[in-house]
Design a protein with these regions (language model features):
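Active-site neighborhood of phospho(di)ester-bond hydrolases with catalytic His/Asp-centered motifs
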Residues: 34-37, 54-61, 90, 203-208, ...
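General small-molecule cofactor/ligand-binding pocket signal
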Residues: 5, 88, 113-117, 131-133, ...
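Conserved beta-strand hairpin/beta-sheet module of binuclear metal-dependent hydrolase folds
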Residues: 1-49, 144-146, 153, 194-205, ...
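Metal-dependent phosphodiesterase/nuclease catalytic metal-binding core
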Residues: 24, 118-263, 271-284, 300-314
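Active-site metal-binding motif and surrounding structural segment of the metallo-beta-lactamase
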Residues: 38-88, 116
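Structural recognition of alpha->loop->beta junctions
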Residues: 111, 277-294
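Metal-dependent catalytic neighborhoods of phosphoester/phosphodiester hydrolases
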Residues: 68-76, 100, 271-280
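Active-site neighborhood of divalent metal-dependent phosphoester bond hydrolases
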Residues: 81-116, 269
C-alpha cells in the first residue's frame, strides 16, 4: 500500500485553509515526509498521519519547505523517540538544514543525519527506492521519486499441481526464479512464472519550472504530484519566479504518460476557489485533481484506479 496525505498545499505562506508544503508518504509500514514547512507537525496531528517518520526528503531550503523541521524534531523527542532520522536534501543544503536541526539540539535526544543527494541518489530499501532528480527553480533544488522494484510474475499454482510439484518450499523457490528437481525431473521456473510486473512510481516535483527532467522521471508514473503555483494568466510571473502554471503541470503529465496528476503549491489567490486551475489543467490532461490539505490518496497496485480515502475534517 502506498498512501499520500497532503499536509500542506499552499505556496509561500499559509492561508486559512491551506498550510505550506508537506506530504506524508506511507509505503507499507514505512513513513516519510516530502518537505516539512512550518506547521507540518500540527497537520500531522490533525490528519493522523503518524509521527513514526523515518526520513524527510527536502526539495530545497526555501522557508516554506523546511521551517517545520525544528518543531517536529522537538515533539519527537518529547514523545521519547530514540530511533535516528535522516534528512535528505539537494546539493548545498547541509548548512541550512544543520542550522535548523541545531535550533532544537538541546531537546533532541536521537541522532539526526543530513545527506546531500545528486540526481539518482537517495534512500534504498528492500523493495523500493526514493531518488532525487534535478529540477529548475533558480536555486539548488530537486524533486523526489518513490520507485518500487518490479514484483514477481504470477505463479501458476494449477499448472504446478498438474506437474506433480508438492506444495511447500518448492513453490517459493520457483516463484523466485529458481529451478527445482522433482522425482528426477528438472522443473524450470520459467514454465510456471509469468513476466515480472512493474512496481508503482510516485513523483513529487517540488518547486520548479516545467522541465525535461521531471518528464523523464515521471515517465509512466502512477501519480505525478506537480506544483501549480499560478494559473495560465500568470505565465510570465511563473517563468521569472521559477514556478509552473496548472497548464505547465498538465503538459508535463501528458508528455510523461502519468496515470494521474495532483496539483499542489497553490498561490494564496487560488486558495478558496481552485476550479479555474483544475479546469485549465484538465483541458490538457483530464486525469487531474487539485490537492487540498487533508486529502489522502491511496495508490493501488496496477489493477485499478486510485481511491480517495478520507475527506479533510472541517
Amino acid at each position: 500500500m502506498i498512501r499520500l496525505t497532503f499536509l500542506g498545499t499552499a505556496a509561500a505562506r499559509p492561508t486559512v485553509g491551506r498550510n505550506v508544503s508537506g506530504i506524508a508518504v506511507q509505503r507499507e509500514g514505512d513513513l516519510f515526509l516530502f518537505d516539512c514547512g512550518e506547521g507540518t507537525q500540527r497537520q500531522m496531528m490533525r490528519y493522523q498521519s503518524g509521527f513514526g517518520v523515518q526520513a524527510i526528503f527536502v526539495t530545497h531550503t526555501h522557508a516554506d519547505h523546511v521551517l517545520g523541521i525544528t518543531g517536529l524534531l522537538r515533539t519527537m523527542a518529547l514523545q521519547g523517540r530514540e530511533d535516528g532520522l535522516t534528512i535528505y536534501g539537494p546539493r548545498g543544503s547541509t548548512r541550512t538544514l544543520d542550522a535548523i536541526v541545531r535550533l532544537g539540539e538541546d531537546r533532541v535526544g536521537f541522532p539526526v543525519e543530513i545527506v546531500e543527494c545528486r540526481a539518482g541518489e537517495g534512500h534504498r530499501a528492500d523493495e523500493y527506492r526514493i531518488v532525487a532528480f534535478d529540477v529548475q527553480h533558480g536555486t539548488s533544488a530537486v524533486g523526489w521519486a518513490l520507485v518500487e522494484d518490479d514484483r514477481l510474475g504470477r505463479f501458476d499454482i494449477g499448472l504446478a499441481h498438474e506437474m506433480g510439484i508438492p506444495e511447500g518450499p518448492m513453490f517459493g523457490q520457483l516463484h523466485r526464479g529458481e529451478d527445482v528437481e522433482v522425482d528426477g525431473r528438472v522443473i524450470q521456473a520459467s514454465e510456471l512464472v509469468g513476466e515480472a510486473r512493474p512496481g508503482r512510481t510516485v513523483v513529487y516535483s517540488g518547486d520548479t519550472r516545467p522541465c525535461a527532467q521531471t518528464v523523464e522521471c515521471a515517465r509512466s508514473a502512477d501519480v505525478l504530484v506537480h506544483e501549480a503555483t499560478f494559473g495560465a494568466e500568470e505565465e510570465e510571473r511563473a517563468r521569472y519566479t521559477g514556478h509552473s502554471t496548472a497548464s505547465d503541470a498538465a503538459r508535463v503529465a501528458l508528455e510523461a504518460g502519468a496515470g494521474e496528476l495532483l496539483l499542489t503549491h497553490l498561490s494564496a489567490r487560488y486558495s478558496d476557489d481552485t476550479r479555474g486551475l483544475e479546469e485549465e489543467a484538465r483541458s490538457i490532461f483530464p486525469s487531474t485533481r487539485v490537492a487540498r490539505d487533508g486529502m489522502s490518496v491511496e495508490v493501488p497496485l496496477r489493477s485499478g484506479d486510485m481511491a480517495e480515502l478520507a475527506e479533510p475534517s472541517s
